[in-house]
């Protein structure tokens, strides 16, 4: 009989998952859930090599739909964006730490935001006037104002997309998501059994690029015997059932024997 190990950096969602799976019959003899970042995959079960590792890099719908977590600009809430609300600085605090050039670079590098310069300037101007950017709707209003130069017919969609990219960029920074993913990818082949498999679900191009590069490099080094040459995407039917699956990409790798 196998054993399932699961980790979640979010202690709130972790407990919900534990209760949900326990009600489905997954007791402690079958399931171990740890409050742990997957960058520490080598500490999940020291000395154990896994048959299969699945990493889901996305923010959950439960996190997005809770305005108190600050992941959405569609409802007002604190500008938090931390996956683990018990540690680290909030997105609001992070904004106050950055100068205009640093914020512009963050938006450009983490989410390819085309209006990074205008948004960064708008945020810093608020701080210079003694104002605050502490809530999700305050940031939304700033982005809306920064893009007011666009023609009215284009503005609504442009503001929506820039908000999505800006919140993504801040979330990546606040949670050190690229650094965490890099650490996980470096350790991954060393926790798999010979012939063991790994599958990783990504939700934006920056994540997918890191996974693709790591798998290819480790394949060349002989750590993997086979890797996905192309991403697997959700079917149109799945996207209709779950619109948030639309951006999902899956890549896999097989540990060398």
What is each of the regions a protein language model found here?
Residues 1-257:
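S-adenosyl-L-methionine-dependent methyltransferase catalytic core, i.e., the SAM/SAH-binding region
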